[in-house]
Amino acid sequence: GGITQCSTRYAKANNKYMKDDYRPDLESIYLMYFDVNSLYGATMCEFLPYGEFSFVDDDAFETLDILNHPDDAEIGYILDCDLNYPPNLHQLHNDLPLAPEHRNPPHSNFKKLMLTLYSKQNYVLHYRNLKLYIKQGLELVKINRVLKFRQSPWLKKYIDLNTQKRQESSNEFEIHFYKLMVNSV
């Protein structure tokens, strides 16, 4: 399932194309709508783990320079770490907090995937996510464990082939077939 959250959605445009509702004395604001296709396929074209999985020795954690580790390096990492969500970010991140986690919402016996502003203990994530979270202001408190692996864009040719075949399709069956070939991986 997807993320469970309560958020406030508010956006108001103000530009010359709004005719009578346009307020020239205020800043011009445009709203954009994006209909993005093949998000799942696009992520599968990235560098993905494929082999030689091993845990990194505890004393080697100190030498890991995750922030400067290239996204397209031959070696990748999944980390178990503790993260602090500084209070100064709470207002800024309130509508879409980082680092989703499975928690029991108030008055519920069932865990949901939730976005919270809580600090995280033993949070498991890919090193690229950790780089993003730190760049956005979360603080890395401690690395508990690190899983190292070889990575490459090993699915890219398969995804690109099915995407091309889907674009060349001349009937609904083929269109759905090639879409399913990507989404079923």
Please give the residue ranges for each predicted region.
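Conserved acidic
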Residues: 1-185
